[in-house]
Each structure stands twice: as structure tokens, then as C-alpha cells.
Amino acid sequence: MQYLLSKKRIRKNFGKINLVSSIPNLIEVQKNSYNKEFLQLGVPVDCRENKGLQGVLNSIFPIHDLDGSAILEFVRYDFDEPKYDVEECIQRGLSYTAALKITLSLIVLDDSDKSDPKEIKGIKEQAVYFGDIPLMTANGTFVINGTERVVVSQMHRSPGVFFDHDDGKTHSTGKLIYSARVIPYRGSWLDFEFDAKDLLYFRIDRKRKLYVTTLLMALGMSSHDILNFYYESATYKKYKKSENGWIVDFLPELVSTKHLAYDLIDAQTGKVLLNAGQKITFRIAKMLADKGVKQILVKNDSLVGKLLAEDLVNNQTGEVLLGVGEEITNDILTIVNDLQITTVKVLAVGGQCGPYVRNTLFLDKNKDQKSSLVEIFRVLKPGEMATTAASRGLLDSLLFDNNRYDLSEVGRIKINSRLNLDIDLKNTCITVEDIKKIIKLLVDIKDGKALVDDIDHLGNRRVRSVGELVENQFRTGLVRIAKFIVERIGSVEIDAVVPNDLVNAKLLTSVIKEFFGTSQLSQFMDQTNALSQITHIRRLSALGPGGLNRDRAALEVRDVHPTHYGRICPIETPEGQNIGLINSLAIFAKINRYGFIESPYRRVINRRVTDEVVYLSALEEGRYKIAQADTSLCTNDCLIDGLVSCRYDGNFVMVLAQEVDFIDLTPMQVVSVAASMIPFLENDDANRALMGANMQRQAVPLLKSQAPLVGTGIESVVAHDSGTVVAALHDGIVEQVDSTRIVVKTSVKKDAGAPGVDIYNLKKFQRSNYNTCINQKVLVNVGDIVKKGDVIADGVATNKGEIALGRNVLVAFIAWNGYTFEDSILVSERIVKEDIYTSIHIEELELVARDTRLGPEEITRDIPNVNDESLRHLDEVGIVNIGAKVRTGDILVGKVTPKSESPVTPEEKLLRAIFGEKASEVKDSSLYVPPGITGTVIDVRVFSRRGIDKDERTLAIEKQKIRKLVKDYEDELAVIQHFTIVRVKELLVGQVAACSLDSIIIGDKLDEAMLNKLTNEQLLKLKADNSSIMDEISEIKCHYETTRAQLTSQLNSKIEKIQCGDDLPQGALRVVKVFIAIKHRLQPGDKMAGRHGNKGVVSKVVPEEDMPFLEDGTVVDIVLNPLGLPARMNVGQILETHLGWAGVNLGRKIGKMVDDYYSGNNQCTDEIRKFVKKIYANNSIADTIDQVNDQQLIEICQELRQGIYFSTPVFDGAKIADIKQMLELADVDKSGQVRLIDGRTGEYFDRRCTVGYQYLLKLHHLVDEKIHARSIGPYSLVTQQPLGGKSHFGGQRFGEMECWALEAYGAAYTLQELLTTKSDSVEGRIKMYQAIIRGNNNFVSGVPESLNVMIKELRSLCLNIQLEENDEEDENEDENY
């Protein structure tokens, strides 16, 4: 139990549904895609599959030159070790990469050999450097130029065939225009579409449309083939008993709704089925066919208008009377009767079989393959010479060439599935059979026999993860390299070159750098807190290259779709124009090898719910009946109800229990990580839940983190998977602990049985991407036993291994003097005084000393025209000291820059002669603390170019780093040495000495006391007469020496890396980075929020004595507006408040019992045990309570007295009755309301108020970072007006309405000053400055620039306005008149 308390927090779980499968690692989406699927790291070369990087290289190589004299083949690829680790890359501003070495084999062929294949003259194999490839960190991110970035997964339309219609928008009558589109993974798009006249067309790459029959004939089909493929035939046979009658097959699908013109007679029985004038429909015809009607009798004239299925030939002369597909007319019918033709085959057209293909065929001017190919060529390449061979080659290259057209396995699966084909998955080109079947299905859809696709169905959308995105970039780069190699082979003497001479790696690295640096999907990682990191990694974007455009994305794409269930979160998405386009993966969802999102379900076999978990994609799910997770089950996991509500094919249906195929794993699987952290989510309005999920990601990590009293149970999972906490890599025992590192002796045995040593260096006060503070705190003590995966150190915004974004504070829902108006938040002074919502932010400031054309810039303390007060924080080198408290305007790093010579006056010459020349030659270009920053310098990093002399500060920093490395080296060696000595002693005890050493003589029997007197060196030299023991000792000594040599080598290489200097950008000599920690206390203007979308701004910090307080004297921490609840419908916050209130009061009750125990009442332990078991009833912890002794129980209760922590999972959490039960156990009112006393008057409020503990967050919208004040500052070069915005240190806009306000009060001089001197009167500014210097209070405004602009505009309208200046006397004379 102590182990449990020290590593994990005990939570009372209200969940009813047992989880049979754990939550999959939350960042495996990224890691699997890049490391396993793309790079195949850790896979032996011989075992690599043909995918990812291996697949791309196999598809590009071998490369043949144009004349067949050489072949360049791919053999294998390998990666070098990264030059720097992740931390070093972040510190130095480098990318975390590894060199890609590809082994290529150049096969030189004999040109003179005319045989095929040619004789090989020689083979040259070489490993060629192909550039540096970014590696993924353990947290699923990339380090590019020193900053962590995330490559977001992209949702896009899956390759395959899609059938759609235009919703009647194209045609004025609202007629549906059907179309089909074949989308390959790579290559040309192929479209098929109907027009308003029901003719069928095709397009390639959205070029001009052509008749679809042109394509079919170009693919080798004749008119006869086309008609026979797309239409069934019906045979009319002459009825022998009547000259005017025919027998024909009865086909219901050819029947159209109409009134019969003649009797419908069964040909076999002669029975009249329907009389003339009766109505016939497809349904009636189907019923007749089902009853056994096979053939019917029709009159002679029924053949008129039918279309021939084969040529109508005069049997006597062989003459073709009517061609295939042509219409039978009365004249033709007369000829048929005259020639006594007894059998006529016609196309089965009519009713539900439209003549679209036939009509298109007869309007198509192209009648053979040659003309069809030429027609297609002219459309695709207008203006070029069209030949049959060129036309055939173009069509083949566009649609049937593997190098240019690729459906991918996904596309082939989709096409096979949609068209019911069985083509091999390796055939990733479109086939003629595909095209024929697509047209046939499109015609069927037009005829109403099939349905169009739902493009928003997740079976039609897939995810391109980071590995696939980078693979596509690799393909682009390697195609460029392949072209370069072909050109290069043709321009060199092939016998004299090696593969390295043929490759230009920059063509690949430039593409990769561009993608990681500037792509819309490669994003600056959101590092505000652990949740924001994990959410960013799990984000799905429909935007980006090959995706949607946010300006044109329709509502349907953004909307929630039934197939999102368990795959994409319906709640978490941004507010604003990206809503619905950027989504988050559901918490249990996985992405399969084809890029489709899968959700987990438990299999149900004959009503019994098994523990087998099956992941289903959206397409697979539609075929099964899936019950809800909260469906009633009996004790042996069988369905109780006879009828069960299930999801089937996108709808909710009631099915028999024995027909159920699957059941949801957990109700939580619907939502994302952030949404699943909102307790009582089911009681919140979806819009507010969206805000709550989004605002948790904006929570600033606090100085003192606290896990939520009311959680959902996944807080520890999020903290662990985000990588912000430190988890033990192996089982072991903690050897050493300090604030910066943990040393663990692992139980994993290495060679000779020696233990391993894990050293965990903690991150201390590092800056994140968003300037928040990354700091890790130790949780373990020396001697603690740790298991693999245990949290041994808390990270940013975590507490005891659980994510902790805010604080549990006592809130009251009351109105308080209007200070809670419009969601404002009233805060007690205690919150500020005790640093409850204080956060540390770290600013990074950088100074670069460059080599200029006038000479090098110098970092120095000797700065011209700067007094000693300004230099007080600098050391002798000119760099600020760590620990200095700095404010705006202070110098952080002194730097002087050489300036060009200007003409020197005699006075300056004299001054130079007296004071020396240095001051005149340089100007101050130091690094100053920018406006709005006041804090403490916590770190300084100095980087110097290789080869230049290092200053004292640089050397001191290097010594500190080396000292830390040596300490790690000594500690790791000490653990191994200790094991070695102990093990050697164990082996030698009881043995006979075989050599004399110190006080030991040959033949002495060795005991522990004798061995303890020897030094470590002597002990390792001692020999015994037992050879097997000596062999084992030799093995241990050998392992020790080998390990020491390895550690020494590693230490030396690390020290060399530190001392060798840095790779700096061109022209930079030194770079100094200064990190300033800024403490932000809570103050009016800061934004705060709960987890339910309840947000507000701090309006006032009120003294504790004025705040409302409880009857026991407890002062309320925060006052919230009760009116913020009804309209927002986020009732979850009230339930959370009540449950938090119960938790704290239960803790207080346990605390009183513990105090009673310590005061001497030792008999109360049974009562405590009984009470604690009552709280944790129906939880596994209740059984543990029975197993601990009294002392351990009291230790547990000491932890619990701070408050009982609850877990209320999403959709399966605490009900009202559960909350009331907890309130009752805590001996507080079941209503959750108390009587509050007004701190100002000491009187009770009129009625009872809702008071309780709510988890509130401080968001990353701090007033200190929003508001600034300008006195003087920069002006725009064009308008000469002050700039705007904090980043430009701009002013506040004084607009038209503000001018009206001053005009209304007659403040003429104030208005004049604002519109001239303080705005754009350059002359007025200078005069004011001069007047202030002279101590004169009379200011002259001058003419503003905006007036000159207006005059120029009026002149453009031919109105010449001139400003005239009159003397004062003239003005007086004018007044006298």
C-alpha cells in the first residue's frame, strides 16, 4: 500500500463498466508511422518490407542510362548515429538528424556487346551520403533548427472510385447529374459524367470531355462489344399460331409504369395475366415473374422502337438490313415479316435499363480504335502532331504505367470492394475491366439500381500520417536525383566514376528541409502543457497540400458523421473558420496499415460478451450489429434484455440479443483525450464541452501543481504518454537522488551478472515553445524499489504522475457587488498571497556578435556612453550574471560594433587626444531587456565559432558541463565497481589463497574479515586455488574493465564535443543566449476557466476579510456568477462542485479521526477502517484496506485528510444519487448548499448558496502579455504616424468617434495635440522636443502629414489648395475691418 501511495494517487472510481483493454499509447500514431512504417528502425536489412523508405528506393532504382551502358542499383540503406542528442540540438539550435547512407552498385556494361542482356564489364559498390534525415524524438516530435515541431496527420479522400451526383444544382429543373471519379494515389484523375441529355462522357485530368464510347473503343472494344457488355438481350420468336404475334422473355426490369395497350398473355398457358387498360408497374411485374411467368405473347407492332442486339441480316442475300444498336421501324418490321425472319434479338432497354450508352455510341463520330486514340491525344495535347503510336503511348503512360499511375493498395482494395472484383492487390494500375465496370455501375446508379457514395463516410477518407507524408517528399527528391543521375552518366566517362560521383544529395535534402520547415502540416509544437502536446500529436487536419481549402469547405465536410463514432472526437475541434476541418483522434482509436481509423469493440458470441477486443474500420463496422457499452449484462457477462439497441449500417435499430455481433469497449471511446478529461461531460452542452476541451490545452503550468479532486481516471495515462514525466525504464533500486538527477541500479543483469545503471537527468527550468517553464521534480527516495513504467519524477503540470493543469479552489456561486458581471471572476487575496495561481514564464533573448566589413563586433563591458549603474549586472566579460534581477532597459550582454569614420572636427581631435580613440570608433549595440520584462536571469549559454579564442565565461560554462558529465561517469562506475567487489568477495570466501598478498599467505583459508582488510585493487589481484572460481572472477574483472573503458571512451567523446566549439551561421563569431524567468501572479485581467467551458476574466482581487466565508470561518477563494450557468447549460460544473465539496469534507472527517487516534484513542482504528471502506465501497482499494495493519492505515489516512480524490469516467460516472451519498457520508447538507456570511457586514446572505471545490485553470492569456503603454516609440515611414500593436511598441488608436467625444466637450487644445504632435506632425514633434529641453511650456503643433495627403488628393480632382501664412499684424487688421 505504501508503494501504491508513493507512486500513484488513490481515487474512488464511480465507473460501472470494467475496462478489458488498456488505452493504447497515445502517441504511437506518430511513432509507428515514422519509425516502423517509414524508416523501419531496428529491422535487419534482410528483413525489411517493401514499404516506406525501402519501397521508395526500390521503385526508383535501378536507374538505366539512355544508351544502356550502365545500371545503378540500390543495395541497402543505413543511418549513422546522430551527432548530438535531442537536448543538445535544442540548446544549440540544430536539427535532430542522422546521416542517411545508401549503398549503391554501379554496373558498367560492355557497349560493344550487341546481345541482350549485355556483358558486365565491372561492378562498383559504394555507400553514398544522401543527406541528413530528421529523426523522431521519444515523444513523437521532431527537432528542427532547435525547436520542437509536430507533423500533423492529414485526412484526405481515399484513392479509389467514387460515385456522386450534383444535388440538382447544375440543371435548372433540379435534375440529378450523376458522375464517377477514379482518384489514384499518384497520377491522372479519370472522370465519368452524365449531361442533361443523359449522354455519358469522360475526362482525363479535368480536360475537355469526350464521349465515353471513345475511351472504350480506344481500349480495343468494338460497337458490338460495347452494347453486348452493357445490355442484356431479349429474343423475340415468331408465334407459330399467329402471324401477328411474337413470344418474348418476360423481364420485369424492362417494365415501365404505364397502362397496357393490349392484354398481357402468358405464352406457356395462354392465360391473360392483365387486361388491356390495366396499370402495370415494376412491382406487379416482379410478382408475376415470381409466380413463374417466363415468357409472354406480344403483338407485331411491339417490336417497333426496339434496338437490335445484333445485325439484322437477309438470310437469302447476306445483306445487312439493320446494324447492331439501330432502331426497328415499321418499314423494317414489314421487311422482317416479308422475309419470314422468325428470331430477332433486341437490347434489353426500357423501364429500369436506360439507353444511355447506346445513345452515346450513336452520337460518337469515332467508330474505331485508331480515330478514338487520336481524338483523345488531341484533347490532352492540343497543337501537337497526333499519330496512332503516339496516341496509344500517351494513353498507356497516363493510365497503365506503374511509374506514372499508382492506385496504391488502398485504392485497389476500394475499387475491388466497390465493383465486386478480385484483382490482385499488387496490381495498382487501373485496368480495362475496372473502367468497364465503373461505367456499368454508374449506369446502374442512374437507373436507380445502386446508390451513390457518401464522401464524408470514414470508409472513403483515410489518414496520411507523418511517415507517408515524408515518404511522398522522399519520392519527389529521389525522382529529381534519378534525372540528375541519368544526365550525369551521359556526360562522364563511366569507367572512371564511382556511385558517389553520380549523386547530388542536395536535391533530396532541400525537399526534406522545405517540408519540415515550411509545410502547412509541419507545425510549431504546442508545448503549453502536457495535454496540449499530446493533443497536437493526435490532431487530424483536412487542410494542407492535397487537402481541402478552408474558404471553400462545405458544411457537410465539417459536420459530425455517424462513422466518426469511436474514431474522431465529435467535441474537440477549433472554434472559428477551421471548425470541423481540424479534428482530434478518439482516445481508443488506431490507424491501420491502410490509413483507415479503427475503433475497438468486444466480440459478442451467442449473447455472451467475451474479452476479445477487435478493431474495426468504418467500412467493416457497417456490416455488424453493435450494442452500446452500457447495455445491461448479467454476472457472467451475458446480455439480459431480449431486444437490444444497436448501431447497424449507420442507423440505430432494435435487434434480438442473439443477433448482436459486438459491443462497445467503453463509453469513453467516443471522445478525444482532452474531452475525456472533463468530468460529467454528459451533463454539459456540446458547445461548452468544446470550449472546455480547447481551454484545457491553454492552461499555464503553475508553480504549485495540484491534480483535480474530481477526475476521470485517465489523468495518469495522459501524463505518462506525453513524456513530460520521467518513467523508470527498468525495475531497480534508487541509488542516488538530487534535484537534477536520479541514479537507479537496475535489476536487469548484463554480462557476468553485473547490474545495469540508469541515470535520469531531469529538466530544470527550461523554456518551452510557448515560453512556459519545463521543470521536473523528483518523487522517489534513496532505497525505493521501482518497477518498469513507474513515475519517478513529475514533469510540467503533473502531480504524483497525474496531469495537473490547475488548482482545486473553494468557489461560491453568488452575486457580489457587480464584480461578477458578464462572467467576471472575483478572487480572494489569499490566492495571490500564497502563489496558488502563480506561474513562471521563461523568455529567451539572443545576441549575435558578427564579423562586419569594418571589423568584428566585440562582447565587452567597455561600452561607450553607458554609466556604471547600467553595467551592475555584467561580469568582467560583459555578460549578465546568473541570478541577477533585471528589469526593462537593463543591459544583459554588452556589445560594441565598429562604425565608419566621419569627418572629425578640431574639438573631437582634442577629445580623442585626451581620452583615447576607442570611444569614437564603436557604437553601442548591446542586448537590453525589452519592455514589459522583469525577472531573474536563470541561465546563460555562450556558443563560440570553432577556432576562435574562448572568453572566461565560456570556459566556466564548459567546466560546469564537464563536471556534470564526470559526476555521472563516477556514479555509474561506482555502482558497477561495488557489485564487482561484493561478488568477488562472495566467491573468495571459503577458498584457499593461491598467492601471498599483504597479510594473506599462500594456503590461508580466506574469510570475510581477511578480505575486508584489502583494498579494492588488492582484492582483484588475489588468487584462489579453485580454477572454476578464478574463471568466474576473471569474467567479472573483464566485464568491469570493459565497462570502465566504454564509459571512459563515452566521457572523452562528450568532453571533446563540448570543447571543440560550435557550428554557427555564416558570419557569426559568438552567440549568447540569456534566459529570464518571469513570475506571473494572478491579477485583474487574467483569463481563467473551468473544464466545462466556464471562462471569465479576473475582475478584482479582494482582501480575505471582505470575502464571503462559511460558518466555520473558511474564506471562499473565488466567487462565480450564478447567472453564467442556466443559459450555457454546462451543469457539469455544479456536479463537480458538489462532489469536490464532498471529497474535501470526507478528508476533514478522516483527519479528525486521525487526530483522535494521535491524541491517545488507539481503539478508533476499527472505526476509521470501516469508514474508509465505506467510502471506497465497490472499489478494489476496499480489499487493500483490509490487508494493511493499523500503522499503515493511519499513514494512508494522513494522505486522505487533504481530500478524497474521485474518478468519474465520461458517460459512466457518478450519478446524482452517488453524489448525495458522498455528501451524506461527509456529514454535510445533501443539497450541497451552505449558509454564507458576508465578509464586509458580518451578516448572513439572504438564502443558502452553492459552495464547493471546483478545478479552475489559469489560461495562457495573461494581462501582462496583452497590455502595454507607449510614451514615445517608432513611427511609420510612409504615414509618419505611430505604429500599432504591442510587438511594435505602438500607440492606442484615437479614432473618429473619440474625436467626436473631445469635440463635444470643447477640448480643442487636447484634440489638436492628439491629431498633430502626437500623430503625424514631424515638425511639431521636433519643436515640442526642443521646447521641453528649454523648459518652455508653449508648444507649436505644426502641419500634420495627413493634411498634406488630403491636399494632394484634392489636387488630383483639379482643386488647387494652397496654405498661406499671415502675420499677426495682418490678422489684427482683418479683425478691425
From Swiss-Prot:
Cellular component terms (Gene Ontology): DNA-directed RNA polymerase complex
Pfam families: RNA_pol_Rpb2_1 (PF04563), RNA_pol_Rpb2_2 (PF04561), RNA_pol_Rpb2_3 (PF04565), RNA_pol_Rpb2_45 (PF10385), RNA_pol_Rpb2_6 (PF00562), RNA_pol_Rpb2_7 (PF04560)
Identification of the protein by name: DNA-directed RNA polymerase subunit beta
Gene that produces this protein: rpoB
Catalytic reaction list: RNA(n) + a ribonucleoside 5'-triphosphate = RNA(n+1) + diphosphate
Organism (species): Orientia tsutsugamushi (strain Boryong) (Rickettsia tsutsugamushi)
Regions crossing the membrane: none
Function (record text): DNA-dependent RNA polymerase catalyzes the transcription of DNA into RNA using the four ribonucleoside triphosphates as substrates.
GO molecular function, one term: DNA-directed RNA polymerase activity
Gene3D superfamilies listed in its UniProt record: 2.40.50.100, 2.40.50.150, 3.90.1100.10, DNA-directed RNA polymerase, beta subunit, external 1 domain, DNA-directed RNA polymerase, subunit 2, domain 6, RNA polymerase alpha subunit dimerisation domain, RNA polymerase Rpb2, domain 2
Assembly description: The RNAP catalytic core consists of 2 alpha, 1 beta, 1 beta' and 1 omega subunit. When a sigma factor is associated with the core the holoenzyme is formed, which can initiate transcription.
